[in-house]
């Protein structure tokens, strides 16, 4: 179960490790409300995924860390896991679809991870990561379906409430559900009146459908 204690612990663990990213006023999108952007594009590795990956790996047992970690990703989760593993001295293997952007692949390698390029799409990379986990004994770091991942991503919600106490609506991507789950937990526990709206692209609206 995802708890507020986990979110607060994640914020404690991540303090001094990740960037506390700013909320930036936006004047170019709409003039019908006061709009702010939570700029996690300024996060180390360039995306919020570092938050969940780092907290998940930090809370593994010594035995789980010693086995090394494995993940599958086409980009941002890969870099988050690689960064966190390097920071903690843990071997990381990342399965990436061959069609992923070269910049993402090279960035993952630059953080010291062993990259396995897998023919096909994301589902093929996921299957290969599970196969290697079972064969080699690695600890699998899921990109979203994990309470520790959600807690790490949810620190965005805590930060927004601390930076914008009067916020009355937060709009966030849904994706696999890790980010919005963590943000919604933080916001609805601490400020129930604030709306949390999830959005998806029409062409990939799996949660909506």
Segments and roles (model prediction):
Residues 1-209:
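PLP-dependent amino-acid enzyme catalytic core
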């Amino acid at each position: 179960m995802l708890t507020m204690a986990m979110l607060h612990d994640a914020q404690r663990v991540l303090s001094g490790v990740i960037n506390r990213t700013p909320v930036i006023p936006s004047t170019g999108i709409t003039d019908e409300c006061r709009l702010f952007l939570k700029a996690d594009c300024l996060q180390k590795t360039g995306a919020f995924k570092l938050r969940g990956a780092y907290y998940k790996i930090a809370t593994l047992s010594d035995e789980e860390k010693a086995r090394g970690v494995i993940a599958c990703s086409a980009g941002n989760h890969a870099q988050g896991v690689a960064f966190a593993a390097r920071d903690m001295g843990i071997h990381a293997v990342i399965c990436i679809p061959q069609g992923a952007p070269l910049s993402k692949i090279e960035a993952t390698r630059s953080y010291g991870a062993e990259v396995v390029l897998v023919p096909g799409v994301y589902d093929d990379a996921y299957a290969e990561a599970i196969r290697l986990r079972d064969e080699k004994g690695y600890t699998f770091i899921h990109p979203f379906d994990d309470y520790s991942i959600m807690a790490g991503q949810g620190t965005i919600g805590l930060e927004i409430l601390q930076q914008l106490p009067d916020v009355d609506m937060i709009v966030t991507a849904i994706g696999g559900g890790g980010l919005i789950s963590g943000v919604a937990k933080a916001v609805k526990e601490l400020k129930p009146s604030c709306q949390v709206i999830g959005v998806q692209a029409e062409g990939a609206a799996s949660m909506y459908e």
